[in-house]
From Swiss-Prot:
Native species: Saccharomyces cerevisiae (strain ATCC 204508 / S288c)
Function in brief: Required for the first step of diphthamide biosynthesis, the transfer of 3-amino-3-carboxypropyl from S-adenosyl-L-methionine to a histidine residue. Diphthamide is a post-translational modification of histidine which occurs in elongation factor 2.
Full protein name: Diphthamide biosynthesis protein 4
Other observations noted: Present with 2010 molecules/cell in log phase SD medium.
Domain J: 6-77
Length: 172
């Protein structure tokens, strides 16, 4: 299923993704009435979005059934993830520093890009982590540690890398 450059069923029916079954049914009826060729003059036909009666019916068929709607929502989410969009609030994928490999010769962390699969698409030095730590005072530090934002060197994907420092204990 490809949703790239196409409208979702929610967009076709002009409803939010958390719409109730009653809202879906009402939107379906309104959309059919407002799109039906007998009810429209050519000047106000929905040609920009190219929404047809068949697309409206397909959208309703999927969204009105709880099981098919759940599967459709899962497919939408997977598609967005492939494009680098995740629903975690700020639009950034989050990874732990543990997900990265470390090159001891270069003192660099590396990871292949999860979107474009570019080998070593994400890489940054250990000194960059030190700078990040130095630039955050104790009041700004999140409870889960520190965060670094970094972009893939081959595509537009940005990642939020979560990390913490291990406190060295005296006498060891």
């Amino acid at each position: 299923m490809s949703l790239v450059n196409s409208l979702t069923h929610y967009e076709i029916l002009r409803i939010p993704s958390d719409a109730t079954q009653d809202e879906i049914k009402k939107a379906y009826r309104n959309r059919l009435l407002n799109t039906h060729p007998d009810k429209l003059s050519k000047s106000i036909h929905d040609t920009v979005s190219n929404v047809t009666i068949n697309k409206i019916q397909d959208a309703y068929k999927i969204l009105s059934n709880i099981k098919t709607r759940r599967e459709y929502d899962r497919l939408i989410l997977e598609n967005y993830k492939r494009q680098g969009f995740h629903n975690c609030g700020d639009g950034l994928d989050e990874f732990s520093l543990d997900d990265f490999s470390f090159d001891e010769d270069k003192l660099e962390f590396m990871m292949n890009c999860p979107r474009c699969q570019f080998v070593g698409g994400f890489h940054f030095s250990e000194s960059l982590l030190d700078e990040c730590i130095d630039n955050v005072d104790a009041m700004e530090r999140s409870h889960s540690g520190y965060q670094l934002l970094t972009q893939c060197s081959a595509c537009s994907l940005w990642l939020k890398v979560n990390f913490d420092i291990e406190e060295e204990q005296e006498g060891q």
